């Protein structure tokens, strides 16, 4: 019955005509549902009264190898208010162990979308049609909720592969299929005073380094800008593991200065969220300093209803509905797209075929 509901949902929405976005009017665009692209602190707060959010995000599949890093870095750690730290996992389908996705969710971490195929080349994502993005992203939302047995409504965020923007289309799919925010868009120009998350009701002022970027009015679609770091040679890098230069691996003081210098650019200015955007291998090779961490969706929730840091720290910790994992080990399943054999570790019944683009549940 659940699969029938999901299938009906995926066929119920059609692409709509879009209007060109105009310059943002702060008097018309107000929280909680609209925000102009801006470096101003939400709610008119002073920096000293604003929480400094730090978001640690990981891309790609979750498996028995990289989960060991996640357990070591994230489990049994709390922020200064004694609430558990939260990271965001932008998960791609291939080679993902959905039992481990369920484990991460039950530990309070955010599960978000990174496509089913993660196909190459990046130019595919730049030109992908509405239907292609729907099959990769909207279908993945129901796929990951089903196979990891996590609440459908808790899957809120998207990051497209290779940070390749898709213009208006991906945001239209995101809006049509109940996704709240996108965290794909690099921000390399606005780094001294970073952009806070904003909506696409009106035209964005964010620089477009990996076009095409959205130009339409897409009410209620949130952008979480990926504010670039600056490497030791002064060059911007969005994914920290893609910086062209690094401190010496054996010099912990240099690494500490590298991280703190980038952090202070946020903390000593307008306290825009400080993003630590990486793949798992980087953390396992270069362990991070201890810091307070929240998820990307936590940041969006605060921006929609900003409160001073004293009030924020006094709030009760979030609670999450725990979900069971009726474990199944499935395979080998031969994939039709490449003829490779896969094993799947799921929190649901085994599919008849290897799930893939166009057949996210692996139905006959």
Curated annotation (Swiss-Prot):
Pfam family, one: Polysacc_deac_1
Alphabetical list of SUPFAM superfamilies matching this protein: Glycoside hydrolase/deacetylase (SSF88713)
EC code(s) of this entry: 3.5.1.41
GO cellular component: extracellular space
Upregulating conditions: Up-regulated in response to 20-hydroxyecdysone (20E) and juvenile hormone analog.
Domain NodB homology per the UniProt entry, residue ranges: 52-292
Bridged cysteine pairs (disulfide): 24-36, 29-34, 83-317, 208-213, 237-243, 325-347, 330-350
Cofactor(s) annotated in UniProt: Zn(2+)
Molecular-function annotations in GO: chitin deacetylase activity; metal ion binding
Sugar-modified residues: 168
Superkingdom as given in the UniProt entry: Eukaryota
GO biological process entries: chitin catabolic process; polysaccharide catabolic process
Binding-site positions, Zn(2+): 60, 114, 118
Tissue and organ expression note: Expressed in midgut where it is found in the peritrophic membrane, a semi-permeable acellular matrix which lines the digestive tract (at protein level). Not detected in foregut or hindgut (at protein level).
Signal peptide extent: 1-15
Main location (coarse class): secreted
Subcellular location: Secreted
Reactions mediated catalytically: [(1->4)-N-acetyl-beta-D-glucosaminyl](n) + n H2O = chitosan + n acetate
This protein's UniProt keywords: Carbohydrate metabolism, Chitin degradation, Disulfide bond, Glycoprotein, Hydrolase, Metal-binding, Polysaccharide degradation, Secreted, Signal, Zinc
Family listed: Belongs to the carbohydrate esterase 4 (CE4) family.
Protein task: Hydrolyzes the N-acetamido groups of N-acetyl-D-glucosamine residues in chitin.
Protein name, UniProt field: Chitin deacetylase 7
Originating organism: Bombyx mori
Taxonomic classification: Eukaryota, Metazoa, Ecdysozoa, Arthropoda, Hexapoda
């Amino acid at each position: 019955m659940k699969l029938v509901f999901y299938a009906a949902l995926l066929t119920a929405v059609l692409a709509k005509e879009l209007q060109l976005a105009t310059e943002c009017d702060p008097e018309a665009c107000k929280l909680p549902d609209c925000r102009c692209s801006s470096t101003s602190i939400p709610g008119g707060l002073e920096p000293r009264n604003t929480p400094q959010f730090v978001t640690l995000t990981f891309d790609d599949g979750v498996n028995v190898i990289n989960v060991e890093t996640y357990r070591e870095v994230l489990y049994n750690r709390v922020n200064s208010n004694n609430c558990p730290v939260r990271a965001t996992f932008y998960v791609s389908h291939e080679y993902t162990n959905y039992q481990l996705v369920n484990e991460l969710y039950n530990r309070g971490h955010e599960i978000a979308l990174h496509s089913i195929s993660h196909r190459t080349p990046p130019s595919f994502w730049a030109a992908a049609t509405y239907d292609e993005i729907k099959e990769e992203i909207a279908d993945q939302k129901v796929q990951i909720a089903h196979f990891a047995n996590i609440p459908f409504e808790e899957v809120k965020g998207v990051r497209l592969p290779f940070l390749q923007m898709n213009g208006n289309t991906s945001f239209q799919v995101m809006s049509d299929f109940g996704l709240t925010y996108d965290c794909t868009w690099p921000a390399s120009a606005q780094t001294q005073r970073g952009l806070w998350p904003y909506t696409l009701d009106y035209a964005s002022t964010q620089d477009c380094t990996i076009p095409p970027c959205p130009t339409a009015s897409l009410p209620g679609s949130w952008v979480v800008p990926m504010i670039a770091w600056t490497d030791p040679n002064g060059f911007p890098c969005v994914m920290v593991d893609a910086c062209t230069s690094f401190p010496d691996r054996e010099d912990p003081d240099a690494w500490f200065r590298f991280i703190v210098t980038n952090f202070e650019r946020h903390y000593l200015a307008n306290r825009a969220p400080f993003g630590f955007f990486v793949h798992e291998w980087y953390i396992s090779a270069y362990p991070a300093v201890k810091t307070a961490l929240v998820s990307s969706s936590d940041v969006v929730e605060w921006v929609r209803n900003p409160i001073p840091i004293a009030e924020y720290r006094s709030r009760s910790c979030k609670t999450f509905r725990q979900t069971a994992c009726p474990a199944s080990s499935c395979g080998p399943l031969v994939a039709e797209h490449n003829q490779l054999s896969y094993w799947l570790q799921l929190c649901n019944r085994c599919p008849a075929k290897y799930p893939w683009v166009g057949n996210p549940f692996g139905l006959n």
